[in-house]
């Protein structure tokens, strides 16, 4: 007995999958300041460690501080009817947000970092 052949119409109706253009779900990397916090900790107290919970708290604190400085700086730019954010607005925002001596130290360290960066790029 000969094998049965499928009807021609049924053979043409093969379902083809459309090529998928979906990207694979990659694990999103979150940017943290953990390595920098750890470096500063070791400069100040070489024999002290930090727990994961404390590191998360410090990271949140730094993110919050940067966000507040950026928000205040952008308000100053809009208030002065300018289009460019300069170091002057950032310094003023730091003076407004941080108390006395802490603001002075932050501004001097920031100025030092900008000067170092400017000299290295030239």
Curated annotation (Swiss-Prot):
Gene3D superfamilies: Histone, subunit A. Signal peptide: none annotated. The modification N,N,N-trimethylalanine is found at residue 2. Belongs to the histone H2B family. The nucleosome is a histone octamer containing two molecules each of H2A, H2B, H3 and H4 assembled in one H3-H4 heterotetramer and two H2A-H2B heterodimers. The octamer wraps approximately 147 bp of DNA. The lineage of its organism: Eukaryota, Sar, Alveolata, Ciliophora, Intramacronucleata. It is found in: Nucleus; Chromosome. One of its GO terms (cellular component) is nucleus. Pfam families: Histone. Residues 1-28 are annotated as: Disordered. It comes from Tetrahymena thermophila (strain SB210). The modification N6-acetyllysine is found at residues 5, 42. Acetylation occurs almost exclusively in the MAC. Monoubiquitination to form H2BK115ub1 gives a specific tag for epigenetic transcriptional activation and is also prerequisite for H3K4me and H3K79me formation. Keywords: Acetylation, Chromosome, DNA-binding, Isopeptide bond, Methylation, Nucleosome core, Nucleus, Ubl conjugation. Core component of nucleosome. Nucleosomes wrap and compact DNA into chromatin, limiting DNA accessibility to the cellular machineries which require DNA as a template. Histones thereby play a central role in transcription regulation, DNA repair, DNA replication and chromosomal stability. DNA accessibility is regulated via a complex set of post-translational modifications of histones, also called histone code, and nucleosome remodeling. There is a cross-link at residue 116 (Glycyl lysine isopeptide (Lys-Gly) (interchain with G-Cter in ubiquitin)). GO terms for molecular function: DNA binding; protein heterodimerization activity; structural constituent of chromatin. Residues 1-10 have a biased composition (Low complexity). This is Histone H2B.1.
């Amino acid at each position: 007995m000969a094998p049965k052949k499928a009807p021609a119409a049924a053979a043409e109706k093969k379902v083809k999958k459309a090529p998928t253009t979906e990207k694979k779900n990659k694990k999103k990397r979150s940017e943290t300041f953990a390595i920098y916090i750890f470096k500063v900790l070791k400069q100040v107290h070489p024999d002290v460690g930090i727990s994961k919970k404390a590191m998360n708290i410090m990271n949140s604190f730094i993110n919050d501080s940067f966000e507040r400085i950026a928000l205040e700086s952008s308000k100053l730019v809009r208030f002065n009817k300018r289009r460019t954010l300069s170091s002057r607005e950032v310094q003023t925002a730091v003076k407004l947000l941080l108390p006395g001596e802490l603001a002075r130290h932050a501004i001097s360290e920031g100025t030092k970092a900008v000067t170092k960066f400017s000299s290295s790029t030239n």
